[in-house]
């Protein structure tokens, strides 16, 4: 009898210790796009204006709902998407420890200071954020150390002050969401953004999203910027080009941060 009782217990332990189920890359991105992502040297990108809709959005229920909610409330006239793949080391399991460590890398917003992107107008690399810091609130703006979490929260809200060499010194909210196979964050501007003296994006009119989805042997990274841009001739094109290259800079930053986890 003692032996028969131990067998179910061993089976239960084996089940508990298994990593959470993740959809395959083919299921998330489609077979053709998955094949492109596996061999692409650069992220796949899409830029749309006027009446945009997602074209690169992975088939992931939570992410699809999040993007639909943002689109419904914002009604963007600019939608910039990028999709790329991060190949995990063989030893990586996407277990709870790795997820917590990855979240802590993503909430280290001070590390965004100094990252570079390619400026289409200047035809050279340029600093994206000159400064970046977590703050206590949009009102007080007191700088805080990057937060570190010992457990994985379902959601959390951070505020940040970031000085952008193109759009100036602005305050943002960062909403993070986590689940068995994903970590998402959405950055929203809480102050109006100007390109010099030219109004570019009004308050709460930019939502930038980064979604990290486990797909077994890799992580699928979806980044999107949805914006309601000012009605200034040429502004949509200018911001579209800028945001595409900025998204690539964020993906490079993510790759470097993920390298410290896996």
Task: Give residue ranges: language-model regions.
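A short acidic/glycine-rich loop-to-helix N-cap element
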Residues: 196-201, 227-246
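Bacterial N-terminal signal peptides
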Residues: 10-18
């Amino acid at each position: 009898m003692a032996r028969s009782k131990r067998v179910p217990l061993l089976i239960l332990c084996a089940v508990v210790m298994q990593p959470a189920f993740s959809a395959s890359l083919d299921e998330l991105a489609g077979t053709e796009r998955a094949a492109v992502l596996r061999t692409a040297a650069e992220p796949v990108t899409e830029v749309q204006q006027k009446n945009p809709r997602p074209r690169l959005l992975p088939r992931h229920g939570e992410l699809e709902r999040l993007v639909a909610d943002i689109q419904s409330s914002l009604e963007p006239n600019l939608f910039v998407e990028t999709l790329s793949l991060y190949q995990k080391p063989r030893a990586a399991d996407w277990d709870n420890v790795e997820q917590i460590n990855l979240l802590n890398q993503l909430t280290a917003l001070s590390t965004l200071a100094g990252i570079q992107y390619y400026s289409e107008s200047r035809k050279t690399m340029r600093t994206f954020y000159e400064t970046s810091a977590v703050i206590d609130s949009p009102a007080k703006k007191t700088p805080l150390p990057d937060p570190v979490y010992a457990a994985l929260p379902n959601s959390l809200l951070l505020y940040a002050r970031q000085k952008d060499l193109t759009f100036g010194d602005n305050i943002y909210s960062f909403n993070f969401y986590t689940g068995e196979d994903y970590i998402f964050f959405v950055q929203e501007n809480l102050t109006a953004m100007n390109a010099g003296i030219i109004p570019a994006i009004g308050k709460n009119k930019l939502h930038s999203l980064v979604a990290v989805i486990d797909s077994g042997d890799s992580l699928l990274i979806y980044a999107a910027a949805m914006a309601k841009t000012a009605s200034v001739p040429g502004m949509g094109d200018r911001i579209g080009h800028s945001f595409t290259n900025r998204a690539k800079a964020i993906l490079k930053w993510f790759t470097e941060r993920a390298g410290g986890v896996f």
